[in-house]
């Protein structure tokens, strides 16, 4: 019986400010209109695994779906086996586990004199009819922040012969994300990211990851 778990790790570097919204259920007068999601323990920005998974799946659907899928449950088999499918007749658990990504270079930012790991960007919309202004404050994780990124991929008898194909899809997803954006307001310059120090490691069982590491660093 084959059973192994592969950890895919990388660093996400923010090339522009990133906004992934947090809770604004309570906002005092003068507070930021749209705060970013933060770790409740440290109050430092995080990148939720759900945001990474959802964005990557959406981008890959444009490549690997033969037709436009109205819902994720209508995705192609290759995406369903990686990300999961909740549709009754096609239900399956995904082979990928996405972890939340936490800030990893706080000390470096501190040494540069950074006083806060977030910034506030002031934006404005103008009503074209009334010329009324609608100013708002958007919080962003700052440029040059890096976050530890981690995926867990499970290998069993069922997918032992599909591992390399799956990792090519993962590689494509990372490249597409670099060419797109993460979080909100990407068309206005937010959320440009780069994946660095890509590495696959066997963390349970026996599996030679040499070929996988070659795939991850190959040009798309």
From Swiss-Prot:
Statement: the UniProt record of this protein carries the keyword RNA-binding: yes
Record-level Gene Ontology MF annotations: endonuclease activity; RNA binding
InterPro entries: CRISPR-assoc_RAMP_Csm3, CRISPR_Csm3_endoribonuclease, RAMP_III_fam
Keyword Transmembrane helix: no
Cofactor(s) this protein cannot do without: a metal cation
Regulation of activity: Target ssRNase is inhibited by EDTA.
PANTHER family: CRISPR SYSTEM CMS ENDORIBONUCLEASE CSM3 (PTHR35579:SF3)
Entry function: CRISPR (clustered regularly interspaced short palindromic repeat) is an adaptive immune system that provides protection against mobile genetic elements (viruses, transposable elements and conjugative plasmids). CRISPR clusters contain spacers, sequences complementary to antecedent mobile elements, and target invading nucleic acids. CRISPR clusters are transcribed and processed into CRISPR RNA (crRNA).
Family designation: Belongs to the CRISPR-associated Csm3 family.
Name of this protein: CRISPR system Cms endoribonuclease Csm3
């Amino acid at each position: 019986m084959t059973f192994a778990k592969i950890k895919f790790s990388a660093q996400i570097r923010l090339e522009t400010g990133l906004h992934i919204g947090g809770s604004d259920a309570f906002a005092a007068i003068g507070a930021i209109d749209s705060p970013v999601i933060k770790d409740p323990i440290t109050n430092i920005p995080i990148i939720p695994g759900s945001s990474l998974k959802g964005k990557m799946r959406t981008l890959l659907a444009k490549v690997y779906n033969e037709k436009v899928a109205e819902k994720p449950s209508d995705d192609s088999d290759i995406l369903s086996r990686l990300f999961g499918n909740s549709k009754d007749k096609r239900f399956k658990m995904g082979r990928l586990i996405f972890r939340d990504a936490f800030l990893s270079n706080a000390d470096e930012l501190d040494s540069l004199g950074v006083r806060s790991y977030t910034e506030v960007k002031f934006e404005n919309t103008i009503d074209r009819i009334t010329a009324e202004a609608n100013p708002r404050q958007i919080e962003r994780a700052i440029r040059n922040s890096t976050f530890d990124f981690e995926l867990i991929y499970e290998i069993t008898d069922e997918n032992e012969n599909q591992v390399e194909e799956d990792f090519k899809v993962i590689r494509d997803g990372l490249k597409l994300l670099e060419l797109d954006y993460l979080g909100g307001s990407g068309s206005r310059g937010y959320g440009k990211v780069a994946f660095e120090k890509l590495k696959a490691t066997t963390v349970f069982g026996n599996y030679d990851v040499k070929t996988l590491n070659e795939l991850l660093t190959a040009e798309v």
